[in-house]
Amino acid sequence: IAAGGYTTTAVDNVETWNGSSWTEVSDINTAKYNSGASGGSPSSIIFGGLIQPGTVKSETESWDGTSWTEVADLSSGRWGPGKSSYGTSASALCSGGNTGSEAVTSTEEWTAPAVFNQIQEGQLYFNSNAFKETIQDVSGAAWASITASNTPRFGLGGAGTQTEALIFSGAGGSPTANRPQTEHWNGSSWTELNDLNL
């Protein structure tokens, strides 16, 4: 799934890939680019990003395979956080990024309960075929601040899960420069590993 982007302005387009072609599906609620994302089709989240140069967003949107819903925001707006699939739409990490004025080291952990859009509840009535369908709201999705990474940066790469991940490269500092650092997340802390050759 690909969501958002930039042409001459931020766009809200969303497309899914079926192995041979792209298909346009429901748009995200806020047009933005340089966002973080986790998960895939049919269940994803997109978080942070820019709506125009200098305007940073903190919103998180959740994809259920049909539509996007705004859910819990990041603690602060940022663009260019680690963008790789750090998990699913139910568990993810947001590492680093740029607040619009500086690169940051903050890391936030996303957790969401299992959500059931429709719970089918059958009830037996004498001499009846009645069926009741119930919609249930399951709250509790949230971002929580956890141990910050060691190097402030944005536009970084990443891979892994909530309990085992790598972040690498990116840019940061003043003046902005390439960052060669690679860091490992073990579920509770970040450790710097060998630097990339830039």
Question: Where would I find each of the regions flagged by the language model?
Answer:
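Polar, enzyme-active/binding microenvironments
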Residues: 1-198
